[in-house]
Amino acid sequence: MKKVFVKTYGCQMNEYDSDKMVDVLNATQGMEPTDNVEDADVILFNTCSIREKAQEKVFSELGRMKALKAAKPDLVIGVGGCVASQEGASIVSRAPYVDVVFGPQTLHRLPDLINRRQQTGLSQVDISFPEIEKFDHLPPARVDGPSAFVSIMEGCSKYCSYCVVPYTRGEEVSRPFEDVLAEVAGLAEQGVREVTLLGQNVNAYRGAMGGTSEIADFALLIEYVADIPGIERIRYTTSHPKEFTSRLIELYGRCDKLVNHLHLPVQHASDRVLAGMKRGYSVLEYKSIIRRLRALRPDMSMSSDFIVGFPGETDADFDKLMAMVHEIGYDTSFSFIFSPRPGTPAANLHDDTPHEVKLRRLQLLQATIEENVQRISQSMVGTVQRILVEGPARKDPTELHGRTENNRVVNFALPGVPQAQRDRMIGQMVDVNVTQAFPHSLRGEFVVRQ
C-alpha cells in the first residue's frame, strides 16, 4: 500500500486542508498517511507565507528532500498552500525535483496532478482560484477523535496592508448553508462531539440557503449547528472584529454550546497603527465587543494575534498595546515581529525601528501573555471543569486526557474505574476537579456525578 507524508505549516485552515489532501489520496489511490518521511511514496508540504521565516523554512525543507528524491526517483514531492499560490512555477525553478505545485483551492485536483506528472514526466502547477469547487470533489471526512474542523468559507476580502492572504487564498467565498450542516451532521453521526468552524474571516460567513434567495449569516449557521444531535461544543476561528455583529454577541447569552473561549485578533492597540494596518476598526470598537461579550459571559477567555514593530510603531504605541494586554487579560496568543511581505502595501512603508527594539518589545509582550496564561491556569485549581475526553494520557495510558472550554489539556486518573468503562468515556463529556496547574497542562480528578 502506498503512503503519503504531509508536513503542515501555519494556521488551522492548513491543518484542515492537509487532512483533506490525505482523504482525497486515500479515496482515489488507496494511500495511507505515514509519519515517516522515508517510508512515503508521496511527500507534501502544505505551506504558509504569512511571514518570511515560515516561507524560507519550506525551501530549507525542500533542500533536504533532494537526496531522498535522488535515491527514490519515483517519489512524488508536492508543494501546496499559500507559498505555492504566491510563488507558483518559480518553486520548480528553484527546486526542479518538485513534481506538483497546487494552491489551497486546487488540492482536490492533487490525484490528477500526480497522474499527469507520472505520465508526462513534467512538473505540474495549478494555483488557480476555482472558488468553492473543491468541496464538491472532496470525499467524506475521516473522523479521528471526538473533535473535528469544518471549513465554512475560504479567502479574505479585508486586504489588511501587511497581509498576503487575499492574494494567496483569494476573496471571501462561503460554502452553501446546507452543505456545511450536512458535513457537521455526518461528523456527529461518526461520534464527533465538538466542531471548530474554520475560515480566514469565519464570522464573515454568508452562505446561500438552498431553494431560496436568502443568505444565512454566521450567527444563524451556529444556531443550526447547535441543533444537530450529538454536537455538544462549538468553536470557531479566526474571527474578525469588523464582522462581529450584535446577533453573534447576543448568541452567547442563549447558546450554551458556544465555548467560553474566543480568538479575536486585535493585532495592535494603537488607533494610529491599526489605521496603518487597514484593520477597519478602532481600539474602542474592539473593546466594546469584549465588554458586551463579558457582560453575557463574565468568565470568557480571550486570545489574540499581535504584531509588534509595524512600521512607525513608537514606544507610546507599544505602551498602549501592553496596557490592553493587561486590561483584557489575554490567554494563550500568537505574537510576531512585523514581516514585510512582497506585494503588500505595508512592505513599502518606511521602517526605522531597529530590530533589537522590536525583539525587546516582542519578548516583553510574550512574557506578559505567559504570565496571564499561568495566572488563568492557576485560578482553575479547585474548580470543576467540564471536559471533552479525547483519549489516553500521553505519559500514562492508564489515565485519560481531554480539553476544557478554554482549550487547556487536562490529564486525570480514574482510580477504581474498570478499563472497559474508561474506554467508553472517550468522546464523552465528564466532570474533572482540577488539582494542579502546570505550564502547558492541568491535572485533575474524575468527579462521579450523583
From Swiss-Prot:
Swiss-Prot/TrEMBL cofactor(s): [4Fe-4S] cluster
Every MTTase N-terminal domain range: 2-119
Positions contributing to [4Fe-4S] cluster 1 binding: 11, 48, 82
Binding site for [4Fe-4S] cluster 2: 156, 160, 163
Cofactor note text: Binds 2 [4Fe-4S] clusters. One cluster is coordinated with 3 cysteines and an exchangeable S-adenosyl-L-methionine.
Disulfide bonds: none
Signal peptide: none
Start and end residues of each TRAM domain: 378-448
CDD domains cross-referenced by the UniProt entry: Radical_SAM (cd01335)
InterPro entries assigned to the protein according to its UniProt record, in alphabetical order: Elp3/MiaA/NifB-like_rSAM, Methylthiotransferase, Methylthiotransferase_CS, Methylthiotransferase_N, Methylthiotransferase_N_sf, MiaB_methiolase, rSAM, rSAM_horseshoe
Keyword Ribosomal protein: no
Enzyme Commission numbers on file: 2.8.4.3
Keywords: 4Fe-4S, Cytoplasm, Iron, Iron-sulfur, Metal-binding, S-adenosyl-L-methionine, Transferase, tRNA processing
Primary role: Catalyzes the methylthiolation of N6-(dimethylallyl)adenosine (i(6)A), leading to the formation of 2-methylthio-N6-(dimethylallyl)adenosine (ms(2)i(6)A) at position 37 in tRNAs that read codons beginning with uridine.
Quaternary structure and interacting proteins, as annotated: Monomer.
Family, per entry: Belongs to the methylthiotransferase family. MiaB subfamily.
NCBIfam families per the UniProt record, alphabetical: miaB-methiolase (TIGR01574), MiaB/RimO family radical SAM methylthiotransferase (TIGR00089)
Name of protein: tRNA-2-methylthio-N(6)-dimethylallyladenosine synthase
Gene expressing this chain: miaB
